[in-house]
A protein has these predicted regions:
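Second RecA-like catalytic domain
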Residues: 1-257
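Charged, non-catalytic accessory extensions
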Residues: 177, 260-290
Length: 290
C-alpha cells in the first residue's frame, strides 16, 4: 500500500503512535495533504474569520481550528448521521468534500499502519469517542503541546520567528508576514503591509515568538505564511528543525543554521541530551520506508 501523504507526514504519524496521540496526528497529516476545507465567501469574510477563530477554542493555532472542526463534524456524522453532519458543515462555511477527503485519507493511513503490524486493528465499536486506532494509542490525544510538537516535526523546516510588530523571519526569508486568513494575523490586512503608521503587535506576538506554518506564497505585498500555530521555544528547538551547532561557550544552540537559542549556563547540555533521547525514537532511524 502506498502512503497517501508525503514521507515527512508519514513519519509524523508514526510519532503519533509512539507518543500515543494517534488520532489527532492522523487527522492533521490528512489536513496537510489536502486543501483547506474552510470556505471564505467574498460576502461573508468576517463571519468566516470568526468561525475559524471560534473553532480554535482559544488556542493561537489554525491547525487546531481545523482539527477541532473536523473532529466535531466526524462526531456529528457518527452520532446523528451524514445529513446532520453536512448541515453542520454548511452552517459553518466548510466544504463537505474536503472533510470527506480528510476522512478517507486518515482511514487509509490507519489501514496502512495495521497492514504493517505497527498498530492493532480495532473495530469502530471499541474506539473511544470515535477516535481512530486503539484507545491505548490515544491516551495523550488531548495534550495540545505534544500534538503541536509532533506537527512541528512533520512540517519542519517551516519555522518562523517574530522580529517586529508585523514581520517574521524564516530560514529562507528575512521578511515574511502572517497571511490575513490566519487567526494569528491580529487583524492585519494586505493593505497594512508597508504602511508607515505605527502598529500594535499585529502578528503572532512580541519579537521572539515562534510559529510553525504549513505553506508560504509570494504576493504583491511580500511573503505570506499560511496556516500558522504559535509554539514554545523548546518545541521549536527539539522538533521543528535540525540542531546544527553544538554547545559553545556562549551556551547558544542553533536550529537549521539560522535560529539561535540562548540558555543559562549549564542548561544547553541538558537540552542536547533531551534532544538525543527524542532522536532515539525518530522514525527516520527505522529500517523501512514510509
Amino acid at each position: 500500500m502506498v502512503s497517501p501523504v508525503p514521507p515527512a507526514l508519514g513519519k509524523m504519524v508514526l510519532l503519533g503512535a509512539i507518543f500515543k496521540c494517534l488520532d489527532p496526528i492522523l487527522i492533521l497529516a490528512s489536513i496537510e495533504s489536502t486543501r483547506t476545507f474552510f470556505l471564505k465567501p467574498p460576502n461573508a469574510l468576517e463571519r468566516a474569520n470568526e468561525i475559524r477563530t471560534n473553532m480554535a477554542l482559544g488556542l493561537p493555532s489554525d491547525h487546531y481550528a481545523a482539527l477541532n472542526a473536523y473532529r466535531e463534524w466526524r462526531f456529528i456524522k457518527q452520532e446523528q448521521g451524514r445529513n446532520a453532519a453536512n448541515e453542520y458543515a454548511f452552517s459553518n462555511l466548510m466544504h463537505v468534500g474536503g472533510l470527506a477527503m480528510i476522512e478517507k485519507t486518515s482511514l487509509q493511513m490507519l489501514e496502512m499502519l495495521v497492514e504493517w503490524d505497527l498498530v492493532r486493528d480495532i473495530p469502530p465499536s471499541l474506539r473511544y469517542n470515535h477516535e481512530l486506532g486503539d484507545p491505548e494509542l490515544n491516551v495523550n490525544s488531548d495534550v495540545q503541546p505534544l500534538v503541536l510538537a509532533l506537527l512541528s516535526s512533520g512540517l519542519a523546516p517551516n519555522l518562523a520567528v517574530q522580529t517586529s510588530p508585523i514581520l517574521l523571519q524564516t530560514g529562507s526569508d528575512p521578511k515574511a508576514i502572517i497571511h490575513p486568513s490566519s487567526i494569528n494575523s491580529g487583524g492585519l490586512s494586505i493593505k497594512d503591509v508597508g504602511s508607515s503608521k505605527k502598529h500594535r503587535y499585529l502578528g503572532a506576538g512580541p519579537p521572539g515568538t515562534l510559529l510553525l506554518f504549513s505553506t508560504k506564497n509570494s504576493m504583491s505585498g511580500g511573503i505570506f505564511l499560511r496556516e500558522t500555530s504559535i509554539i514554545g521555544p523548546l518545541t521549536g528547538l527539539m522538533f521543528a528543525g535540525k540542531l546544527k551547532s553544538v554547545v559553545d561557550r556562549s551556551n547558544v544552540l542553533t536550529v537549521d543554521d539560522w535560529l539561535p537559542f540562548k540558555f543559562e549556563m549549564g542548561v544547553a547540555p541538558q537540552v542536547c541530551q533531551l534532544i538525543r533521547c527524542v532522536d532515539n525514537v525518530n522514525p527516520s532511524n527505522l529500517c523501512f520506508d514510509i
